[in-house]
């Protein structure tokens, strides 16, 4: 039986407790949907010392011609306090036209809809005029070490090549059809430690308080603004996310203080140029402090996150036009082409082929009582089905 009903597909996926890193039966359920449609399915276990093994899935159907990939994840975030849920988080309960469950929106719902869309397309038109593949990880909500990155490497090593990719993350703020993500800002994180001299709070002249310096350094990182945005991206923004001293004694000046930060940056910067700008700001703040009269520059060190995410923008007109045209045909809305929000696994896929993102409404993702309207599942399936037909029509032209 073809899995043409997104509601049934989603219920089967939600009932699998696939909290990262557990597979929870979700990939097995997905494989059971794809096999009857003619997909060859591979389950790929990725490993890395010091991290949990992660099971992933790659499936492909079709033959020669353009190759369209759908990417996503079956892993979900923890449910939190289960007693706070109005319905069990892995029950796929339906009430008042909505299905409840962890992953309903992020992003088992998107997977369920694309499976249904592909099944409907093949049922109506036969095999695609090319190939369709699913690249599904169990490690998106976690550290993302043994997930999409390694699955892409595995598939590419086998000779897989893709012409375009659609990621089914929830991209719409309010209604299906609001927004398509055509790129993402970069993300860079670091931790700064300022070293001082420990001493008695009553004798500050005998000590060197690093808290004074870390506060000034934190301010220098955030102000002035890094830029005022670009044509396709909002202004780069740095947030200091924590300041830590680890000192419980109120009469002791600490020996060191640290601060962590994250910056989301636009295409005016690379990770490397941004690092240089941040270090220049740190040097100026450390050297010229009115809070440190008569003292040497503050001594600091910075440790960068090992894996910055690079900014990217997709300019593939056939892909974007096929998707935006499908959205408008089904919903009547002209979607906004956006680069807002956080990072996703599209940041890895962009190194292999053009990629865009479109899925459900994200209002309840990661929340207690995460849920999706059944009508939205049908609408998204219709958009995906229309997109498949339009994209293969463009690609074959």
UniProtKB/Swiss-Prot annotation:
What cofactor does this protein call for?
A: Zn(2+); Co(2+)
Q: What class of enzyme is it?
A: hydrolase
Active site per database record: 75, 140
Please list the coiled coil stretches: none
Give GO MF terms, alphabetically. Answer: acetylornithine deacetylase activity; cobalt ion binding; succinyl-diaminopimelate desuccinylase activity; zinc ion binding
Please give the catalytic activity noted in the UniProt record: N-succinyl-(2S,6S)-2,6-diaminopimelate + H2O = (2S,6S)-2,6-diaminopimelate + succinate
Entry similarity comment: Belongs to the peptidase M20A family. DapE subfamily.
Give the protein name, as stated in the record: Succinyl-diaminopimelate desuccinylase
Taxonomic source organism = Rhizobium meliloti (strain 1021) (Ensifer meliloti)
């Amino acid at each position: 039986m073809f899995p043409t009903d997104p509601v049934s597909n989603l219920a089967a996926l939600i009932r699998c407790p696939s909290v990262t890193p557990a597979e929870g039966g979700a990939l097995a359920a997905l494989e059971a949907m794809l096999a009857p449609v003619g997909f060859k399915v591979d389950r790929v276990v990725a490993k890395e010392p010091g991290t949990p093994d992660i099971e992933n899935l790659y499936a492909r159907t079709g033959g020669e011609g353009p190759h369209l990939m759908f990417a996503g994840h079956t892993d979900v975030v923890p449910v939190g306090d289960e007693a706070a849920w109005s319905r069990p988080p892995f029950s796929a309960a339906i009430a008042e036209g909505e299905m409840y469950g962890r992953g309903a929106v992020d992003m088992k719902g998107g997977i369920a809809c694309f499976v249904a869309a592909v099944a409907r397309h093949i049922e109506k038109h036969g095999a695609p005029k090319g190939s369709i593949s699913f690249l599904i990880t169990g490690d998106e909500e976690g550290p993302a070490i043994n997930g999409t990155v390694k699955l892409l490497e595995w598939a590419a090593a086998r000779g897989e090549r893709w012409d375009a990719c659609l990621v089914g993350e929830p991209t719409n703020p309010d209604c299906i059809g609001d927004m398509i993500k055509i790129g993402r800002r970069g993300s860079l994180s670091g931790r700064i430690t300022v070293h001082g001299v420990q001493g008695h709070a009553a004798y500050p002249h005998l000590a060197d308080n690093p808290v004074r310096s870390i506060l000034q350094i934190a301010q220098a990182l955030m102000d002035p603004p890094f830029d005022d945005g670009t044509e396709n991206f909002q202004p780069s923004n740095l947030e200091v996310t924590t300041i830590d001293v680890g000192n419980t004694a109120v009469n002791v000046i600490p020996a060191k203080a640290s601060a962590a930060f994250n910056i989301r940056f636009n295409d005016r910067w690379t990770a490397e140029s941004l690092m240089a700008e941040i270090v220049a700001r740190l040097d100026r703040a450390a050297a010229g402090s009115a809070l440190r009269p008569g003292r040497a520059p503050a001594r600091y060190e910075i440790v960068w996150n090992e894996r910055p995410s690079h900014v990217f923008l997709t300019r593939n007109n056939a892909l974007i036009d096929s998707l935006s045209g499908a959205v408008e045909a089904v919903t009547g809305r002209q979607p906004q082409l956006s680069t807002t929000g956080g990072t996703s696994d599209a940041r890895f896929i962009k190194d292999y082929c053009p990629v865009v993102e479109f899925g459900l409404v994200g209002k309840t993702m990661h929340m207690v009582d995460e849920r999706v309207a059944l009508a939205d599942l049908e609408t998204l399936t219709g958009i995906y089905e229309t997109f498949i037909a339009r994209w293969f029509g463009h690609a074959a032209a």
